[in-house]
């Protein structure tokens, strides 16, 4: 297996313009494909997940052109539901941001479509979404294991009264919200259980509004969506920088700044993960906000005990930042780490112990006490981009760290390690 050893880093300083947000990129691509008119998307993320979405749209007959660096996409919308040219199988890798929304959107047509992906995708639950789509009339079969992909879709979704479980993934609700306006009937979506990752629903609603569709949101417990609507292209749309990707650089600034400035997001960003900066501030770093930047300056870091449900992806970065904080850090209400690219709670606990931390892994929390001195270890990344990026922070000590399968960052940030090196002064 390929590996990358990062030597100790004395200081991190400078600015980085963030790649486009994965969450925003894939939502914007799907809405542009469903919309009337041509959309020009700029600062689109070039990554595995986005390529899977683009390949699927291409197979569904959507025409688009990409710039040489793949960050600008000119896409001609279908002006309604996506239509397959006959029976079709779409391979979506391990891209939840493609699998969930497409599973819903493709229930509007009548063709037979199979959605499948990598082995890990077949372990990521989708049963709650399928149950909700079936309540709206969709005809869906599981082809292997009940409640998991691959799925066979045969259209039939018309809207109506639908319940969705919000406790596992907000992507299920996102998928229903984006599909419902195109259904023939009005749709009322009721959310059961505590809605996780609520800020991601705000991204969805914000993008739908940009494409001309507004819905009634009753305290995130009930959503009323008029049927028979159309999305309309906004013309040009700038994808904001990826706030989850910003977390590694902001954390590096907190631990070994200098000052690190990330551009492409700021105080007006629609992504909930910008709240990660507030957590670093609570830990002792200094944060400066602009309209299109966030800067972090080193401070003496101390441990925190916090509910992280609102920033589940960026919260992983706090788990490795905790190695540099005084005291024991507890991250709570993070059960949905277990159903991401890998079981992130198990993976994080396992790898933190390798570098010497004392770790308590609960059902939905993790408690981390840093060692007096970090140990050099080979870090397993579990084919999870965030594990690789989180553990790069270990090098901000006087100990090297070896990252196994470093190319897994291609899911959201293909040149992450080059960018980190560019801003780092070796010890």
From Swiss-Prot:
Give residues annotated as binding phosphoenolpyruvate.
22, 96, 124, 171, 344, 386, 411
Reaction it catalyzes: 3-phosphoshikimate + phosphoenolpyruvate = 5-O-(1-carboxyvinyl)-3-phosphoshikimate + phosphate
Q: Does the keyword Amino-acid biosynthesis apply?
A: yes
UniProt keyword terms in alphabetical order:
Amino-acid biosynthesis, Aromatic amino acid biosynthesis, Cytoplasm, Transferase
Q: Where is this chain primarily localised?
A: cytoplasm
**Any matching Pfam family:** EPSP_synthase
Keyword match Cytoplasm = yes
Pathway the protein takes part in: Metabolic intermediate biosynthesis; chorismate biosynthesis; chorismate from D-erythrose 4-phosphate and phosphoenolpyruvate: step 6/7
Q: Per the record, GO CC terms?
A: cytoplasm
- UniProt-listed PROSITE patterns: EPSP_SYNTHASE_1, EPSP_SYNTHASE_2
Residues of the active site = 313 (proton acceptor)
| GO MF entry, a single one | 3-phosphoshikimate 1-carboxyvinyltransferase activity
Q: What class of enzyme is it?
A: transferase
Tell me, which GO biological process terms does this entry list?
A: amino acid biosynthetic process; aromatic amino acid family biosynthetic process; chorismate biosynthetic process
Where can this protein be found?
A: Cytoplasm
What HAMAP family is this protein classified in? EPSP_synth
| Function summary | Catalyzes the transfer of the enolpyruvyl moiety of phosphoenolpyruvate (PEP) to the 5-hydroxyl of shikimate-3-phosphate (S3P) to produce enolpyruvyl shikimate-3-phosphate and inorganic phosphate.
Q: Subunit composition?
A: Monomer.
| Name this polypeptide is given | 3-phosphoshikimate 1-carboxyvinyltransferase
Q: Which organism is it from?
A: Salmonella paratyphi B (strain ATCC BAA-1250 / SPB7)
């Amino acid at each position: 297996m390929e590996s990358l050893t990062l030597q100790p880093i004395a200081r991190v300083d400078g600015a980085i313009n963030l790649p486009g947000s994965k969450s925003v990129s894939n939502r914007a691509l799907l809405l542009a494909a469903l919309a009337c008119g041509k959309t020009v998307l700029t600062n689109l993320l070039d990554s595995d997940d986005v390529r899977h979405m683009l390949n699927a749209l291409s197979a569904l007959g959507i025409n688009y052109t990409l710039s040489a660096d793949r960050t600008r996409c000119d896409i001609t919308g279908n002006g309604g539901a996506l239509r397959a040219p006959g029976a079709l199988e779409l391979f979506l890798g391990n891209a939840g941001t493609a699998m969930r929304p497409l599973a819903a959107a493709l229930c509007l047509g009548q063709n037979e479509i199979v959605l499948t992906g990598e082995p890990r995708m077949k372990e990521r639950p989708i049963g709650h979404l399928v149950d909700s789509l079936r309540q709206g009339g969709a005809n869906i079969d599981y082809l292997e294991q009940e409640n998991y992909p691959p799925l066979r879709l045969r259209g039939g979704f018309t809207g109506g009264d639908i319940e969705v479980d919000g406790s596992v993934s907000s992507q299920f609700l996102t998928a229903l919200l984006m599909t419902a306006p195109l259904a023939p009937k009005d749709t009322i979506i009721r959310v059961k259980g505590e809605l996780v990752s609520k800020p991601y629903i705000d991204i969805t609603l914000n993008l739908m509004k940009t494409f001309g569709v507004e819905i009634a949101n009753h305290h995130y417990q009930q959503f009323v969506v008029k049927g028979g609507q159309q999305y309309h292209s906004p013309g040009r749309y700038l994808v904001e920088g990826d706030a989850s990707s910003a977390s590694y650089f902001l954390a590096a600034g907190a631990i070994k700044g200098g000052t690190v400035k990330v551009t492409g997001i700021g105080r007006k960003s629609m992504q909930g993960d910008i709240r990660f900066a507030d957590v670093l501030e609570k830990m002792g770093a200094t944060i400066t906000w602009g309209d299109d930047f966030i800067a972090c300056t080193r401070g003496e870091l101390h441990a925190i005990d916090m509910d992280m449900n609102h920033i589940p992806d960026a919260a992983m970065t706090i788990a490795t930042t905790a190695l540099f904080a005084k005291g024991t850090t507890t991250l709570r209400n993070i059960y949905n780490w277990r159903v991401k690219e890998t079981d992130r709670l198990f993976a994080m606990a396992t790898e933190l112990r390798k570098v010497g931390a004392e770790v308590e892994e609960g059902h939905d929390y993790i408690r981390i006490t840093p060692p007096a001195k970090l140990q050099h270890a080979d870090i397993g990344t579990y084919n999870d981009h965030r594990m690789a990026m989180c553990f790069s922070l270990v090098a901000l000590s006087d100990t090297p760290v070896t990252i196994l399968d470093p190319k897994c960052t291609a899911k959201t940030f293909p040149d992450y390690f080059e960018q980190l090196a560019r801003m780092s002064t070796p010890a």
